[in-house]
Amino acid sequence: MTVDPIHQFEIQRYVELLRVSGVTVSFTNSAAFMVGIVALIFFFLTYATRGRTLVPGRMQSVAEMGYEFIAKMVRESAGTEGMVFFPLVFSLFVFVFVANVIGLVPYTFTITAHIVVTAALALLVIGTVVIYGFYKHGTHFLHLFVPSGVPAFLLPFIVLIEVISFLSRPISLSLRLFANMLAGHIALKVFAFFVVGLGSAGFLGWLGATLPFFMIVALTALELLVAILQAYVFAVLTSIYLNDAVHPGH
């Protein structure tokens, strides 16, 4: 039996939409899952918030808790003025959270285990910071790279460090989510193949597979925790970065 833990991340083309100069634009399994995740979130929130009552039901309670959780996060990270970004942070958190959790279901596709997806989300965040920062503050936004109280002879080096740090944000933001989801799913797949391989050896094989099986259960629980934490970390860092667009001064 051949173990290919990378096969689960393979992009499959469903429909070719466009071909220009040898470059093909297709509707893939990744795109299908992204559309499905957005549709699932939309229908859940629509159903949960319809006919809102003073005493909320279970689904309304989940929606309200999610709202309050993200709203508190944004206020603490970017202040009251930062609430203008609440829709963005809430959408990113819910999207990453649902994508991570759905990716744990067998025979599904983990879109956040693809660097192109996480990089697009990270660039959306940093692009929003830059565009809103210049829109709101003009050239004063550049004060983000000039800390106050720095001696003049050190200023060029500090500015260079600040610029490099800012440019590294989308890289670290995308790689963190991508690497955690990729590594965890590969580990689960390897252990699963190991259990199946031992089980095919008969009774003694199944006895030997007992420990790896429980390790799979533990790894699955850990992966669920990681899926939730990574969505939380992504949202927290997004809020912190957006604070620079609201308050660019050090």
Curated annotation (Swiss-Prot):
Where does the sequence pass through the membrane? 25-45, 84-104, 115-135, 141-161, 187-209, 223-243
GO terms for CC?
plasma membrane; proton-transporting ATP synthase complex
The way this protein sits in the membrane is described as: Multi-pass membrane protein
Give its localization: Cell inner membrane
- GO molecular function, a single term: proton-transporting ATP synthase activity, rotational mechanism
Asked if the Swiss-Prot or TrEMBL record annotates the protein with the keyword Lyase, the reply is no
Q: Does the keyword Cell inner membrane apply?
A: yes
* Family (UniProt): Belongs to the ATPase A chain family.
Please name the PANTHER family in this protein's record: ATP SYNTHASE SUBUNIT A
UniProt subunit comment:
F-type ATPases have 2 components, CF(1) - the catalytic core - and CF(0) - the membrane proton channel. CF(1) has five subunits: alpha(3), beta(3), gamma(1), delta(1), epsilon(1). CF(0) has three main subunits: a(1), b(2) and c(9-12). The alpha and beta chains form an alternating ring which encloses part of the gamma chain. CF(1) is attached to CF(0) by a central stalk formed by the gamma and epsilon chains, while a peripheral stalk is formed by the delta and b chains.
What is the protein name stated in its UniProt record? ATP synthase subunit a
**The organism of origin for this protein:** Azorhizobium caulinodans (strain ATCC 43989 / DSM 5975 / JCM 20966 / LMG 6465 / NBRC 14845 / NCIMB 13405 / ORS 571)
